[in-house]
A protein has these predicted regions:
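A short, N-terminal "cap"/entry segment at the start of jelly-roll beta-barrel domains
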Residues: 2-61, 136-207, 302
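Short, low-complexity cationic-aromatic patches
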Residues: 50, 67-82, 99, 105-108, ...
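Glycine- and acidic-residue-biased ligand/ion/polar-headgroup-sensing regions
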Residues: 65-96, 213-239, 244-245
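Hydrophobic, ordered structural segments
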Residues: 83-162
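Conserved metal-binding segment of the jelly-roll/cupin
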Residues: 100-120, 127-130, 248-270, 277-281
């Protein structure tokens, strides 16, 4: 739900209120600041990789700079692959059928046998449900989610897409940014990805947008530049759980997991291009209710 601090020009001011009846006595989870430039990497055929997680999703990020296999496995649930820049390119083989994808965009892969081979020179991000066998425990921050937060709603899958299962790819440049529409949003059964507008240089300090979410995490993936995440944790009845405001800078690539119901805003403050991708699991009902906001709504019904 937007707060009174949100600038009037922000399209999110028109969103409906989120969930009601949250137990305000429960402790609020810590934010996760995962700057991949500071974390140990796993070496893969395609490049260095980092696996991190929130409560509902695992984020596997690969600095794909050479030809090689990103993943070759069988998934029980759908996955989403983000090609983070124009130089990204992959061959995706799903259930024996191979297709080439190239450019900045979002691909939705149905459950089944998946092989992803890098053919480009830009970072790739694979989104996997945290209940997918064998993935959650790989995360470098897995210990932070040993006990699930009761404040985070479960990731119940949304309706299946009509027609036969297939790999679907949505290129960012085919969905240009528009005034009054918040970013470029793509939805699957389990995920929502928002390719936000880039900031050239620092974001004006008088145009930040503090807001909160009642019952879902926000995964903010910085792919270019530098950001400072400002997070305020509301007081609960137990003073032992009160926290000081946080103002944490992260480079790119990095992932910040923002727990509900913290008040938060992300401030681009790098000197050049700053680019952020917001990820949600499950998809957001409020964004989905806005006509035209979800660019692939016909493929993935609400």
């Amino acid at each position: 739900m937007p707060t009174e601090l949100t600038p009037t020009a922000d399209p999110r001011r028109s969103l409906a209120t989120q969930a009601a009846g949250i137990d305000r006595t429960k402790a609020i989870a810590d934010a996760q600041y995962l700057d991949f430039t500071m974390l140990p990497a796993t070496s893969t055929d395609a490049g260095d990789a980092w696996t991190t997680r929130g409560q509902n999703a695992v984020v596997h990020h690969v600095a794909a700079r050479r030809p090689g296999t990103v993943v070759d496995t069988v998934f029980e649930s759908e996955t989403v692959l983000i090609l983070t820049d124009a130089g990204a390119a992959v061959d995706v083989t799903w259930e024996g059928t191979t297709g080439a994808l190239a450019g900045h965009g979002v691909a939705v892969l149905p459950p089944g046998a998946v092989r992803i081979d890098n053919t480009g020179t830009a970072d790739l991000t694979l989104l996997v449900r945290s209940d997918e066998p064998g993935w959650a425990e790989r995360a470098s921050n897995a210990a932070a989610f040993a006990e699930p937060s009761p404040r985070v709603a479960p990731a119940e899958p949304w309706p299946a897409p009509p027609g036969p299962e297939q790999v679907r790819f949505y290129k960012a440049d085919e969905h240009p940014l528009e005034q009054g529409r918040f970013g470029r949003i793509f939805r699957s059964r389990s995920f929502m990805v928002n390719l936000l507008a880039a900031h050239d240089g620092p974001r004006p300090a008088d145009k930040l947008s503090p807001h909160h979410h009642d019952d879902f995490e926000q995964y903010s993936l910085a792919t270019h530049g530098h950001y400072t995440h400002h997070i305020r944790t509301p007081w609960v009845t137990d003073r032992n759980h009160w926290k000081a405001d946080e103002h944490v800078g992260v480079g790119s690539p990095s992932l910040t997991v923002i727990p509900p119901p913290t008040v938060h805003t992300s401030e681009a403050d790098g000197p050049g291009e700053n680019r952020l991708i917001d990820i949600f699991c499950p998809p957001r009902a409020d964004f989905s209710a806005k006509p035209g906001w979800v660019r692939n709504a016909e493929d993935f019904p609400a």
